[in-house]
């Protein structure tokens, strides 16, 4: 399968949430989420294995490798850009990965409107856009409001991991996560290597340019 084999699902006024070719499409600037009946996760995947989720999946190298290596885990790749979704979809099919589904849409919208409480075992956020300029920081993925949704969808003792090359972004994300979650790493709550993490296109890119990579890991408290 080539990336271009995945066709755009809607045009103009036909925009609506739908599942097609193992991809859940959530249109941008769309507000009729209640009109879509989300299938159960067992229906979505065809089994009841535990669910893991990657945000900012990019070209899909990391999540396809993880799904291939862990067939008893169900994986969700969330990526808002359709050109990248096509690449993930192509790699998924060419690798014959059966335990991966793709969400083409905003992570915040997907979490808020399409995921029930306490269903995700682990969330991995790989190299989100740092939006470094002060006037653009409102666009950052890590916000206090989104953290409430993260806590809601994680199971008790569920984990969230962030990988980034931007230390300022890292420190802001740690500050936000500390409000609702427990750090798994000792202070300063981040490390520069995480064992058995795998790698991604962005990680290889930034390391090739001599940039440091930072990882932080937090866990949901039981009963919150």
Swiss-Prot record:
It is an enzyme of class 2 (transferase). The active site is at 129. Its EC number is 2.1.1.33. It catalyses: guanosine(46) in tRNA + S-adenosyl-L-methionine = N(7)-methylguanosine(46) in tRNA + S-adenosyl-L-homocysteine. It comes from the Bacteria. One of its GO terms (molecular function) is tRNA (guanine(46)-N7)-methyltransferase activity. Keywords: Methyltransferase, S-adenosyl-L-methionine, Transferase, tRNA processing. Substrate binds at residues 133, 165. InterPro entries: SAM-dependent_MTases_sf, tRNA_(Gua-N-7)_MeTrfase_Trmb, tRNA_methyltr_TrmB_bact. GO terms for cellular component: tRNA methyltransferase complex. S-adenosyl-L-methionine binds at residues 54, 79, 106, 129. Pathway: tRNA modification; N(7)-methylguanine-tRNA biosynthesis. Belongs to the class I-like SAM-binding methyltransferase superfamily. TrmB family. Catalyzes the formation of N(7)-methylguanine at position 46 (m7G46) in tRNA. This is tRNA (guanine-N(7)-)-methyltransferase. It comes from Chlamydia abortus (strain DSM 27085 / S26/3) (Chlamydophila abortus). The lineage of its organism: Bacteria, Pseudomonadati, Chlamydiota, Chlamydiia, Chlamydiales.
């Amino acid at each position: 399968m080539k990336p271009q084999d995945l066709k755009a699902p809607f045009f103009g006024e036909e925009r609506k949430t739908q599942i097609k070719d193992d991809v859940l499409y959530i249109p941008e600037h769309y507000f009729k989420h209640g009109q879509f009946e989300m299938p159960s996760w067992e229906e979505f995947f065809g089994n009841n294995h535990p669910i893991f989720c990657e945000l900012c999946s990019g070209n899909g190298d990391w999540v396809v490798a993880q799904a291939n290596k862990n067939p008893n885990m169900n994986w969700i790749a969330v990526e808002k850009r359709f050109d990248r979704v096509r690449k993930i979809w192509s790699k998924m099919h060419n690798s014959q990965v059966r335990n991966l589904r793709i969400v083409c849409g905003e992570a915040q919208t997907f979490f808020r409107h399409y995921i029930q409480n306490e269903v995700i075992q682990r969330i991995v956020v790989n190299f989100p856009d740092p939006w470094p300029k002060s006037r653009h920081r409102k666009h950052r993925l890590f916000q206090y409001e989104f953290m409430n949704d993260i806590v809601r969808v994680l199971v008790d003792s569920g984990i969230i991991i962030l990988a980034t090359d931007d230390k300022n972004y890292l420190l802001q994300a740690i500050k936000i996560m500390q409000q609702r979650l427990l750090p798994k790493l000792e202070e300063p709550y981040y490390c520069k290597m995480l064992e058995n993490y795998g790698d991604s296109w962005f990680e290889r890119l930034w390391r090739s340019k001599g940039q440091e990579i930072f990882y932080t890991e937090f866990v949901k408290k039981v009963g919150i």
